[in-house]
Amino acid sequence: LENLRIPVARRPEYRYLDVEPEFITTARDLAYVTLQENNAIGVFHLRKRAWVKTYPLGRLPLVIDASDRDGPFGSRAIALNDQVHGLPMPDSLTSFRIGSRTYLATANEGDPLSSRKDSMRAKRAGAHGPSLDPSYRQRLKERYGSDPLLDANLGRLQVSTIDGDTDGDGDLDELTAF
């Protein structure tokens, strides 16, 4: 469990309470289990009845339109120019074989837990959002030429308040979307 994203703060001996299986697929003697809120896939050996491994899925670089614009039929065209990171957070899952290899396909669904504790760990990036590292805020300001956290820029984007602090100093060094 050391490498899993555990969104609710607990004492280490109780971290297992926040591992939440979502979907399961099987291939031979293995069951693959999506752990959505933990942003991981677990592997369970069916005959041995034991967990073999968990694979944290990390963060993915994304280019999206996080603005408050509606797109082609609205006030302006979609502008895919916002660079953020996203959590895959796998939901449904299937497996298939090609030759001797097993592959997994997931439908990813970034979503904070519905509990009050986890909902506090997801905020809009706007004016009252999470604290940003000053150098990161400056880079965003240079990119947007104005306040990057206006709704017309990144302000409406729902971000994690725990996944973008890459240096552990308490502020976000990268925006990580759900």
Per-range role (PLM):
Residues L1-F178:
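Beta-sheet-rich non-transmembrane sensory/scaffold domains
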